[in-house]
């Protein structure tokens, strides 16, 4: 059966979007027969993407519900770049109109979004989670109220931190982000037993109090050009440790996100673009 799709990207973090509000796509994707999610996301034999977004009717009086799948078929709780892509899709299809606040239902809870054109989509990402039990992580809370510990990787002792934005994140500070063995460290740390549900991994280089560089190893995807929830988690940890202000530009391989955590309390706000790449139809 032929189904329409659109491909969107937020800072190069790309997604195949299906409107699943009036068909059986949700059931088909849940079954993932013959690993067809992986096939669709394959950049050589499929459409190619970091993940898939299904737009569904909300169960909680939100505008829509977002379900997301990683390229390996796993289902994460939330995705910051993905939710901006969903908003851009709805905007391009004239569904948003003059709404000033667009509530989206996700596996991580209700997320409030705002749009001023597809180049400028702001997301209230909710309050960060720093309780080790709720992240979850086996790292212990340090004196600054951030989960922290060390992990040994061959001859390296890595000082790591943790936070959650509805999904788990490990933060590792490095002096030269381009000089690390990224593939080796990322794949090892994603599956480390200090994170029972695996984790997204972010290598962070501090530029100054208002600017940081981040390189992303995404859980279930591997290297990606950006991670919205990860950018927020990084800002939460850097601001708690006094390495940045409560707002900073986060420079990822795919571009810049603006992240703010006012007064180090309440929700984190993320702002950035999401743009259409192309549309088509495919047999599923």
UniProtKB/Swiss-Prot annotation:
Compartment(s): Cytoplasm
InterPro entries (UniProt xref): DAP_epimerase_AS (IPR018510), DAP_epimerase_DapF (IPR001653)
Binding site for substrate: 13, 70, 80-81, 167, 200, 218-219, 228-229
Gene3D superfamilies per record: Diaminopimelate Epimerase, Chain A, domain 1 (3.10.310.10)
Cellular component terms (Gene Ontology): cytosol
Catalytic activity, EC: 5.1.1.7
Disulfide bond residue pairs: none
Pathway of action: Amino-acid biosynthesis; L-lysine biosynthesis via DAP pathway; DL-2,6-diaminopimelate from LL-2,6-diaminopimelate: step 1/1
Quaternary structure annotation from Swiss-Prot or TrEMBL: Homodimer.
HAMAP family associated with the record: DAP_epimerase
Name the UniProt record assigns to this protein: Diaminopimelate epimerase
Lineage: Bacteria, Bacillati, Cyanobacteriota, Cyanophyceae, Synechococcales
């Amino acid at each position: 059966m032929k189904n329409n799709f659109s491909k969107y990207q937020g800072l190069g973090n790309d997604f195949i979007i299906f409107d699943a509000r009036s068909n059986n796509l949700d059931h088909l994707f849940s079954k993932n027969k013959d690993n067809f999610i992986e096939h669709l996301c394959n950049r050589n034999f499929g459409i190619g993407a970091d993940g898939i977004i299904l737009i569904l009717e909300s169960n909680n009086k939100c505008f829509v519900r977002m379900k997301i799948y990683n390229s390996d078929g796993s289902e994460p709780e939330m995705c910051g770049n993905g939710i901006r892509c969903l908003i851009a899709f709805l905007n391009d299809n004239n569904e948003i109109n003059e709404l000033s606040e667009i509530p989206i239902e996700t596996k991580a809870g209700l997320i409030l979004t705002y749009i001023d054109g597809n180049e400028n989509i702001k997301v209230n990402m909710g309050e960060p989670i720093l309780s080790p039990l709720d992240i979850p992580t086996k790292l212990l809370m340090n004196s600054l109220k951030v989960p922290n510990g060390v992990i040994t990787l061959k001859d390296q002792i890595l000082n790591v931190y943790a936070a959650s934005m509805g999904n788990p994140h490990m933060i590792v500070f490095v002096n030269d982000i381009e000089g690390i063995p990224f593939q080796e460290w990322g794949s090892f740390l994603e599956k480390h037993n200090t994170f029972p549900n695996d984790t997204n991994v972010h290598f962070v280089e501090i530029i100054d109090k208002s600017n940081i560089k981040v390189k992303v190893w995404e859980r279930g995807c591997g290297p990606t050009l950006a991670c919205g929830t990860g950018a927020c988690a990084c800002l939460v940890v850097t601001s708690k440790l006094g390495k940045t202000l409560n707002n900073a530009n986060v420079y990822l391989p795919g571009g810049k996100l603006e992240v703010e955590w006012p007064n180090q309390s309440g929700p984190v706000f993320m702002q950035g673009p999401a743009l259409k790449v192309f549309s088509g139809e495919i047999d599923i």
